[in-house]
Amino acid sequence: MTSPMTSPVSGPVVREPASAMTRFSAMEALAAQLSDELVVLSLGGAVDEWYTAAPHLREASLFQQQLGCVTPQALGLAAGLPHRRVVSLDTDGGLLFNLGVLATLGNERPGNLLVVVWDNERYQSIGGPRTHTSSGTVDLAAIARGAGVVHASTVRDVGSFAAACAAGLADTAAPHVVVAKVDTSPEGHAAAGHPVVRRKHSDGREDTYRFVRHVEATEGVMIMGPSEHN
């Protein structure tokens, strides 16, 4: 995750949150449940991990680069394609940057949207300063429920995570928010025996075109027409 515009919680860098699951293992469990869904995900380490864990969803994944925009953009896709399942892979820092989107989810209740929040309790990409969720007081799932998202839960192991995602993908009546407490440290990744994470060899512009062309092909619509200058 990248730094927010305001300073993160002060204090020394802390250990990873107590969790029996790495983010990569959770990604593998989720990827196994997805086929033709559209995925919007955050910037930072999650990008390369998803690129490695879900190669079959490469064209269907939009790698977002603005903090606080992942779930709002996924919500827009869900509204525009109500017959299509959309998955938001957000982060604790990203969601904290735009908590207002939870109120919109609570009011609009898009039944085709699953929101996963990777909560490692830190801004990892700038060295690991803590986010507000590390205090033990700030509960993103509780905030979501308070905003009207009835199906919002926090999970700490792969089995519970997979079950919560399966429930969200099967429910067509309301959105689900799954806050996954994860270990994103290199040590945890190595200890779990995960493969080496491959770097994504494309930039944001190429990713956008790939994603749009995928939506066009699978939906039979034109979103970005031919350029008049070609």
Feature-to-residue mapping (PLM):
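Acidic-glycine-rich active-site phosphate/pyrophosphate-binding loop
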Residues: 37-57
